């Protein structure tokens, strides 16, 4: 566990050039920058100019690009700065294992699994923005956090909301949790209209500012599907205790229902910096200059049930939870492959869920993972099966 909540925090950011990573650095600078945080390492992928600029600005000790072919470019960009440079999978592991009490795990996709697991095993407090650690690895990741002795602080706005309102001494009285979903840009579109949308249209989220892949996952509601599986592991819930409601305003971030009929919710303007600030300052709250809710101007809050015909990702998540085994890894691997194909224009929007369902059908009954090798094997089989369908 990180030492001393009042001391300067030593932090590594895995995925600093993505949407969550850049927002994390913005929060750090608003909370005092180098006066309150020491940055042990930053990692990125292909945006070398941004990674180098971030490392210089925040005074990082180590900068890592996941792309081994870009090592020389990053080294040149940081020449004379005194900042160490590394690349590839070994570089990501080096960043994760570097002495830092806190780690922001914001690498998108399965690429974030290995380094985040390495950080958890050494006992770092993990601010978790990577969904795949829980969707694919599930209890293996939770066990690694417990064995390492660190804390797990969710950064997804929905899970962060639940974490904030969940009364730890009353967990036995939790009846259900309700994850809210904006409905994305296609909430009111017909199936026929959705059949012809492009990636550029799908990425335009009505409320949140996010990266390309996460925005499209939100449009298909696969983002919410992954969050359902995450919530099961994070809060040790049964599948039937997890509900989803569409809430177009994205003001209520999630709710916890108790056995006495009470429902507690966390509200706020849609800004990821709120959840990031809460995680980085935990157990205290920080002072952030984000927009405040104006209830008079807001006037109303709307809720509606998700349409699982137009958005079948929800039922696929429920199926993955009920079947157990490595179906979370199968769902995610197939989804990532289908998503990449959609972005490249090789398949239509609705084909993503169709491919995932067929892959889950074909790989049903795989045993539960007993090691990360089992997780990676299931993921690879799902990706291969999806790729065969796309070819």
UniProtKB/Swiss-Prot annotation:
Top-level class of the enzyme under EC nomenclature: oxidoreductase
Reaction equations catalysed: 2-C-methyl-D-erythritol 4-phosphate + NADP(+) = 1-deoxy-D-xylulose 5-phosphate + NADPH + H(+)
Binding-site residues for NADPH, renumbered to this chain: 17-20, 47, 130, 132, 211
Gene3D superfamilies cross-referenced by the UniProt entry: 1.10.1740.10, NAD(P)-binding Rossmann-like Domain
Cofactor: Mg(2+); Mn(2+)
UniProt binding sites for 1-deoxy-D-xylulose 5-phosphate: 131, 157-158, 182, 205, 218, 223-224, 227
SUPFAM superfamilies: 1-deoxy-D-xylulose-5-phosphate reductoisomerase, C-terminal domain, Glyceraldehyde-3-phosphate dehydrogenase-like, C-terminal domain, NAD(P)-binding Rossmann-fold domains
Pfam families named among the record's database cross-references: DXP_redisom_C, DXP_reductoisom, DXPR_C
Residues annotated to bind Mn(2+): 156, 158, 227
UniProt GO molecular function: 1-deoxy-D-xylulose-5-phosphate reductoisomerase activity; manganese ion binding; NADPH binding
Catalytic activity, EC: 1.1.1.267
Keywords: Isoprene biosynthesis, Manganese, Metal-binding, NADP, Oxidoreductase
Family: Belongs to the DXR family.
Role, per record: Catalyzes the NADPH-dependent rearrangement and reduction of 1-deoxy-D-xylulose-5-phosphate (DXP) to 2-C-methyl-D-erythritol 4-phosphate (MEP).
Name under which the protein is recorded: 1-deoxy-D-xylulose 5-phosphate reductoisomerase
Organism phylogeny: Bacteria, Pseudomonadati, Pseudomonadota, Alphaproteobacteria, Hyphomicrobiales
Gene: dxr
